[in-house]
Amino acid sequence: GALQDTDRAWIVGETSFGKGLVQSVNRVWGGAGLTLTVAKYYTPSGRSIQRDYSAISFYDYYLHRNDNGKHVEEPPRGEALHTNTGRPVFGGGGITPDIEIKPGPQPGRLFYGVFSFVRQLAAGQLAGFREYRIAEMRYKTRLTAEDLNRYPVTDQLVAAFRQYLFTKPQFNVTDEQFNAHLDYIRAQMRREIMTAAYGLEAGEQAFLPDDIQFRKAVESFDKARELADIARRADRQ
């Protein structure tokens, strides 16, 4: 938020959570605690980070959520504040990006299905795929093409995952869902295999080429440079 207010960053992605309270916990009877808000965080323009829940009920707070468990977002309300170069920004709901890019609507069942499948794959428990067994994780901070090629996501591996998924009723994935998200499945399998072999950071690196938010951020470098130039000229005036 501070970087956005001072025009030092061009934000790409999703609206942040909207938690900007400073709270203290006071013990009460029965071992419980009473949380009191004693301060709020504000950005340099005067925006409150905290999402406003005053107009919804306790029931809506817990149940008015989307498929990913997040509160359904509403557009910014109230008076607009401005960045150093005059761009309008709004408070009361986290930090809204300059370019909003939401991840694709992949069913969570596919995410957990891939996770479960790769755990068994890396443990050497899937017949016909012994070459994917990972006896020990070798932590790496930078992947090479050789690392990626050591555990390729082949058509045979994807077919084995399909069969695995359809024998697990808890995932409840249809043929239509599987085929519609085939690119995501391949990318997520690559990510989980690299995580099992080389660590979490390596897994994230493997996923970056398929991350639509990352790709859009890279495409926005020219816009970020333009904004930085405008901010520098404004500072000199």
Model-derived regions: residue spans:
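Short, ordered coil/turn segments that flank beta-strands lining enzyme active or ligand-binding pockets
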Residues: 29, 44-45, 84
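Extended catalytic-interface subdomain
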Residues: 24, 36-57
